């Protein structure tokens, strides 16, 4: 993925191999790897997996940088209530709030096209920043500060990401890259 790209400072590339039978073990590996990478005081870029991968990364990042905001580019909120012990892709943001790692005011949902019925109450109870696709310019003007940026492929228009399981997105590539 990085082949042929030029950077103005050294870049480290690392891999975390998932335990396909144990999500909690995979999260532990990702967390520990992220903690180690943050010690080098360089930006961390993570590619691959569903949004459950973001959970351990965000735990590590927030503990090392308490002022960080979360910009969540996704067609969906991912604030469903957790069922069982596993932290799946659709509960990540809610889990981060419930654990006290992020205040809702530090979370910016961008590109949201669908709010699930079982997410409405939690959304109304919290003061999240919510920007639908037609409000992307408003987000660009209002947002300030440092951020962990998470991009779910389903935020893109279905013509740009036809293989996603949730084809509700409405952003084009230029909007996402800004």
Give the location of each predicted region.
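Conserved alpha-helical scaffold segments that buttress catalytic/binding sites
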Residues: 1-178
